[in-house]
Amino acid sequence: MATTPINANELELQDRVVHINRVAKVVKGGRRFSFSALVVVGDGAGHVGVGLGKANEVPEAIRKGGDQAKKNLFRVPLVGTTIPHEVLGHFGSGRVLLKPAGEGTGVIAGGAVRAVLEAAGVRNVLTKSQGSRNPHNVLKATVAGLKRLRSVEDSARLRGKQAAEITGA
C-alpha cells in the first residue's frame, strides 16, 4: 500500500526528548564521551515520527534526532480522541498493547509510550508495556503498533463492505 510522503514543513511540529544516553569510548588518553538522543515529533493531530540522533554534544544529538524524526513521519488514524481498535506492537522483546478508551480517560501510559501518543494527538487510550523496558524497544514497539492501526474506512475497503456494516450503525 503506497502512501504519499508527509511534508514536515507544512505541519506545526513539536518535538519531545524521550531519552538521552551517554556512551564512552575508551581510548589511550582516557574516555571519550558522546551522546545519543531519542526524539519524538508530532503535530497533535495524527502525525508522528521518531528519530535517534548521535553527537559529541547533547544539543546537537537532540537536533539530529529531531531531523531524523521529521523524515520518519507517519499518519495515525484517530477516532475522535482515541484509536480505532485494540492493537499490539512488537519490537525486539518489547511489546506494547494499545486499547481505545472513552472520553475523559486520558493517556494511561508511561515514558516513551506516553510521549509518542501525546505527540500523535491521542488523548484517551489505555496501554500496557510488557517485556523489554529499554526506551528504544518500547518506543519502536509503540510505533509498530500505531502503524498497524487501520481506520474503519480502510477496513471496510479491504473487506469489500461499507463502513456502516462494520461499525454496526
Curated annotation (Swiss-Prot):
Gene Ontology MF annotations: rRNA binding; structural constituent of ribosome
Function: With S4 and S12 plays an important role in translational accuracy.
PROSITE patterns: RIBOSOMAL_S5 (PS00585), S5_DSRBD (PS50881)
Highest taxon of the lineage: Bacteria
Example GO BP: translation
Subunit field text: Part of the 30S ribosomal subunit. Contacts proteins S4 and S8.
Entry GO terms, CC: small ribosomal subunit
Organism: Anaeromyxobacter dehalogenans (strain 2CP-C)
Protein family: Belongs to the universal ribosomal protein uS5 family.
HAMAP family the record matches: Ribosomal_uS5_B
UniProt xrefs under Pfam families: Ribosomal_S5, Ribosomal_S5_C
The entry's keywords: Ribonucleoprotein, Ribosomal protein, RNA-binding, rRNA-binding
Gene expressing this chain: rpsE
InterPro entries the UniProt entry points to: Ribosomal_Su5_D2-typ_SF (IPR020568), Ribosomal_uS5 (IPR000851), Ribosomal_uS5_bac-type (IPR005712), Ribosomal_uS5_C (IPR005324), Ribosomal_uS5_N (IPR013810), Ribosomal_uS5_N_CS (IPR018192), Ribsml_uS5_D2-typ_fold_subgr (IPR014721)
Name this protein carries in UniProt: Small ribosomal subunit protein uS5
Domain notes: The N-terminal domain interacts with the head of the 30S subunit; the C-terminal domain interacts with the body and contacts protein S4. The interaction surface between S4 and S5 is involved in control of translational fidelity.
